[in-house]
């Protein structure tokens, strides 16, 4: 399956050389973009800001070399504390999507933050420096995670995707591990005291390890995990703590103080759930111990049999029977051992197959090929676009030269202008003795009207 996907990357999109409509193409392109760029941070300057009556916010995010359209829908816009305006430098988070009606790709945003050092960022850096100087981040204070924890406490919100993701990982990898949720708020001022109390309670319950978890959000949303009280409560815990706050790009003070930092709540669960490699090692150890004990048992029985045979004057038929019985037992033991090993190998192969099926390498290989293909096509498309623009510009310059009034003047014609610079199109617009300016292809003449009949006007050069 993997070689086929590498050979034909479009198979994953279900194209298979079929002819698509424009709507189908845009729809599939949107799915691909949203899958690959599901959550990214981008920094740039706001321009063309628009706030329609719907409550949504639209603007263009640009830098010195490029720009991209952005959409901040009403629900997300209501959470933005910063007043947005043209020229504001911001950091935004969202997913890349495609507006199918126009075929234009855009960013669908959920977070907008001012770029640069804001008040929260300065407070973060100050507390980080203070706690670091006190040694709260030092490796000597870290406690190693248990290899096979049986009881784990989870400090998080009782609702939302975070707790569901953690439970899902343990059900899949370690269903026998006992999980206990210590519910707490994970956002707002009241969350600080609740998290501190939850940490103290969990540390007193004798858990093998603790997970402090929250989903992603803005710096302000995650701020309770950057409070000094929470940091010191984590440091005071005897139980090993895994901090899993926000997305992989989010970093909080609790990450530095905790014994281990996980990029996501799901990753924290995987750190504490036994993996297949550990199970493999255990099976190998059991196999070696079983083989060693069976060999020892066989050796003892052979030695015992040899001792008995030496003590007997006429072993005869009894020895042959015992030897045959021993051979039979040896064969049965070998068959039982082989069957046990075969079953263990089948089980191990099945677990390895399941693990390989979930490996991200396949998706990464496809995306890497797709990225290489796009990288090859991009320079060629840019060159073709520049060439087309140059041809269009040359054509427009030629057209302008043809219709330019300067070209007409260059062929010997002139334009008469009155004192206000207005062009004279009719003799009735002039008066006898009126001073006019005649603009030629090169330079101009100052003239005076001698006669203003509808017949050709008689002019004389002024001294």
From Swiss-Prot:
* Predominant localisation class: cytoplasm
Protein's UniProt keywords contain Cytoplasm: yes
Judging by the UniProt lineage, the source's domain of life is: Bacteria
Q: Where in the cell is it found?
A: Cytoplasm
Q: Name one GO biological process term.
A: DNA catabolic process
Q: Where is the signal peptide?
A: none
Biological role? Bidirectionally degrades single-stranded DNA into large acid-insoluble oligonucleotides, which are then degraded further into small acid-soluble oligonucleotides.
NCBIfam families the UniProt entry points to: xseA
User: What does the subunit comment say?
Assistant: Heterooligomer composed of large and small subunits.
Protein name as annotated: Exodeoxyribonuclease 7 large subunit
Give the encoding gene's name: xseA
């Amino acid at each position: 399956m993997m070689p086929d996907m590498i050979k034909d990357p479009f198979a994953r999109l279900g194209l298979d050389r079929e002819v698509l409509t424009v709507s189908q193409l845009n729809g599939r392109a949107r799915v691909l973009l949203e899958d690959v760029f599901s959550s990214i941070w981008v920094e740039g300057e706001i321009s063309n800001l628009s706030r329609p009556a719907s409550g949504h916010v639209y603007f263009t995010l640009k830098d010195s070399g490029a720009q991209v359209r952005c959409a901040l829908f009403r629900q997300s816009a209501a959470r933005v504390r910063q007043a947005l305006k043209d020229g504001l430098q911001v950091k935004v988070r969202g997913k890349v999507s495609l507006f199918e009606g126009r075929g234009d790709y855009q960013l669908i945003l959920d977070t907008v933050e001012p770029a640069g050092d804001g008040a929260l960022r300065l407070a973060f850096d100050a507390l980080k420096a203070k706690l670091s100087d006190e040694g709260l981040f030092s490796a000597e204070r870290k406690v190693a995670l248990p290899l096979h924890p049986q009881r784990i406490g989870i400090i998080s919100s009782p609702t939302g995707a975070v707790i569901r993701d953690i439970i899902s990982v343990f059900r899949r990898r370690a269903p026998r591990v006992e999980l206990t949720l210590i519910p707490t708020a994970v956002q707002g001022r009241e969350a600080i005291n609740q998290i501190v109390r939850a940490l103290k309670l969990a540390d007193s319950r004798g858990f093998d390890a603790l997970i402090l978890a929250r989903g992603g959000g803005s710096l302000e949303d995650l701020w309770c995990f950057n409070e000094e009280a929470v940091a010191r409560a984590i440091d005071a815990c005897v139980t090993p703590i895994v901090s899993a706050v926000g997305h992989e790009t989010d970093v909080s003070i609790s990450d530095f103080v905790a014994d281990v930092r996980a990029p996501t709540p799901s990753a924290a669960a995987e750190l504490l759930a036994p993996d297949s490699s550990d199970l493999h090692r255990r099976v190998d150890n059991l196999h070696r111990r079983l083989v060693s004990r069976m060999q020892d048992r066989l050796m003892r029985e052979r030695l015992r049999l040899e001792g008995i045979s030496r003590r007997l004057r006429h072993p005869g038929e009894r020895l042959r029977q015992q030897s045959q019985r021993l051979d039979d037992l040896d064969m049965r033991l070998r068959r039982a051992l082989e069957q046990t090993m075969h079953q263990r190998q089948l089980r191990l192969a099945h677990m390895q197959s399941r693990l390989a099926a979930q490996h991200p390498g396949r998706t990464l290989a496809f995306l890497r090929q797709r990225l290489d293909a796009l990288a090859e096509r991009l320079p060629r498309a840019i060159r073709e676009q520049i060439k087309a623009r140059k041809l269009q510009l040359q054509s427009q310059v030629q057209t302008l030269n043809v219709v330019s009034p300067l070209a007409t003047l260059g062929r010997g014609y002139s334009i008469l202008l009155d004192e206000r610079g207005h062009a004279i199109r009719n003799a009735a617009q002039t008066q006898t003795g009126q001073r006019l300016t005649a603009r030629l292809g090169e330079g101009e003449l100052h003239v005076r009207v001698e006669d203003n009949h509808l017949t050709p006007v008689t002019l004389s050069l002024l001294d």
